[in-house]
Amino acid sequence: MKIYQIDTSARKEGSTSRALAKKLLDKIKKPEDEVVYRDLNDEMIFISNLTESGMKIPEGEQTEQHKKMFELSDKLVLELKESDIIIISVPIYNFGPPATLKAWADLAARVKETFKYNEDGSRVGLLHDKQVYLVITSGGTKINSKEDFLTPWLKHVLNFFGIKNIKIIAADQMALDYEKSIKEAEEQINKIS
């Protein structure tokens, strides 16, 4: 099995989402499994007019800048396609996703790679048979509350890619009771078989 772990917290040290994702990885990883790790903060991932316009230009007419942007997009798409299990650790920042995760989703959303258009214009995801674990943390936002815009958005993006098997491990409202939130998240991890 290939496990794809994506960390999104801007905090390299002292990140609760990263620490919980590591515990989850240690719990589910078998000795023969391969782990592909991506820290979205290691590269400045962003979407620009160059990226968007480049998606509409035939490959032979793209500039070197277009090609460089697509190298990263191609790599992200391949990592998704080749994975069996995906772990995404993500804190809620101001009710939504970190900017790097939004950019990752934009770069991974590629026609004929992660989704396609049907003749009637509807879209269908192309990535199936994948298990996703979302390790979500927050200071004050309750997961799945009306002020949580991260969780429904991220589930929608993954469904758009064709990924339906999604489990959430939540350590939310840590500012209210940090120890309780961590304990509950660790219990969720321990229940995974």
Please tell me what each predicted stretch does.
Residues 144-193:
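Glycine-rich phosphate/pyrophosphate-binding loop and the adjoining helix
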